[in-house]
Design a protein with these regions (language model features):
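Conserved structural core of kinase catalytic domains
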Residues: 44-45, 56-113
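C-lobe/activation-segment region of protein kinase-like
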Residues: 141-224
Length: 224
């Protein structure tokens, strides 16, 4: 199997590869095996187990997560390659062609309907993603299907108190609403904007910034 390095990783970060099998199919591989011994045997083992467990649970209930997840070793996992750009890349490509974000021509309304449906399915299964306000974490698969990647901030919610679970779910919902307001403002009501303001207030003042571990990234997220 051929592998191309996508992200070089680091002290706390997995190396990320695009691998191509003999059948020509591509997949993403995240590998902690080259991290220092203590990191790979503690954080690395935990993050590999955790992401594999979550994506396997979610793979049976929604198409909004990467499929085909397998645990390659105690320190590595693989998942299906999403054949499409991120929302961030889609926007930048369209802006270079002269399209304005608020024109309504970059993303169809069906994309955001599927975005909302995917979030609802994830929440019903007992999970929250918590980083869907970052346009790099939403891939645009063929047919305008959103796929949510980078699950290192995600949490299971099944045993949380109801008020906390709902507050965290609103963070995910606000991510979808943020992008709908940016790219299709004609579809957003005054009530939607008030909900977005409330969710952003909670995220900024009561939710600690996430610790970026487990996967190296480059560039900045699409600002709202």
């Amino acid at each position: 199997m051929d592998r191309e390095l996508l992200h070089s990783g680091g002290f706390l970060n997995a190396r990320v590869y695009v691998a191509r099998g003999e059948d020509g199919r591509k997949r993403i591989e995240k590998d902690f095996s080259e991290c220092p011994w203590l990191v790979r045997n503690t954080l690395g083992r935990f993050l590999v187990w955790r992401e594999t467990w979550m994506l396997r649970r979610l793979g049976g209930v929604t198409k909004a997560v990467p499929g085909g997840v397998v645990r390659l070793s105690a320190f590595a996992l693989a998942e299906d390659f999403v054949d499409g750009p991120s929302m961030r890349e889609t926007y930048f490509r369209a802006s270079r062609e002269g399209l304005k974000a608020a024109s309504g021509k970059i993303f169809p309304h069906e994309f955001f309907d599927r975005f909302d449906a995917g979030i609802s399915e994830i929440h019903a299964a007992g999970f929250v993603h918590l980083d869907l306000h970052n346009a790099r974490n939403v891939m645009v698969a063929p047919g305008w299907r959103p796929v949510f990647v980078d699950w290192q901030s995600a949490l299971p919610t099944r045993f949380m108190p109801g008020f906390l679970r709902r507050a965290l779910e609103r963070i995910d919902e606000a991510g979808a609403l943020k992008f709908r307001a940016k790219f299709r403002p004609m579809d957003v009501s005054a009530g939607d904007r008030r909900r977005l303001d409330r969710a952003n207030f909670f995220r900024r003042h009561f939710w600690l910034p996430r610790l970026r571990i487990g996967e190296a990234k480059s560039g900045s997220g699409l600002s709202g």
